[in-house]
Regions:
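Structural motif
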Residues: 28-30, 57, 88
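Active-site phosphate/pyrophosphate- and oxyanion-stabilizing loops and adjacent acidic/basic residues
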Residues: 46-47, 104
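Short glycine-/polar-rich loops that comprise or flank the Walker A/P-loop
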Residues: 52-55, 83-84
Length: 147
């Protein structure tokens, strides 16, 4: 919005979400860059999550330094009293933390479940990804069981 010199009306975003939620069993809201991404000057993604009373899943990378980033995000979510379901690891690089160690460390530091990891692939193929998604992510406990 800032680059386009526009002001976003948050009330319209909330109204649109409420309308969508009234007609759909599930509405997935993407975090547009992270929990502290500004939507407007004094309104952040974490404020929107709170105002919409959403549960969250934190998606983290697997590169070195990711635990620091993840913990800063987690601590902010705790400060804002956001409802956190757990974590997903996006292995967007071929190097970095060994996955099982990272998952164990995340659980040990936060006590929250790591639902799985999206593996790194040299050549990304959306059809293959969608087909294999259930092998990567355990969606039990996310609230989709009765849909």
């Amino acid at each position: 919005c800032k680059q386009l010199n526009l002001e976003l009306d948050i009330s319209k975003v909330i109204e649109s979400y409420t309308q969508l939620a009234s007609i759909h069993d599930v509405v997935i809201v993407e975090g547009i860059g992270g929990i502290m991404t500004p939507i407007s000057k004094n309104y952040f993604v974490s404020d929107l999550i709170s105002d919409l009373q959403l549960s969250s899943i934190i998606v983290t990378g697997s590169k070195i330094g990711t635990v620091n980033h993840l913990m800063l995000t987690y601590e902010h979510a705790q400060q804002k009293k956001l409802k956190l379901k757990g974590f997903v690891v996006n292995q967007n690089i071929s190097t970095g933390y060994e996955l099982s160690n990272l998952k164990h460390q995340i659980f040990g530091l936060t006590g929250h479940k790591v639902f799985g990891a999206i593996p790194y692939h040299e050549s990304f193929n959306i059809e293959s990804y969608v087909e294999n998604f259930p092998n990567f992510i355990d969606i039990s406990g996310l609230g989709f069981e009765n849909i």
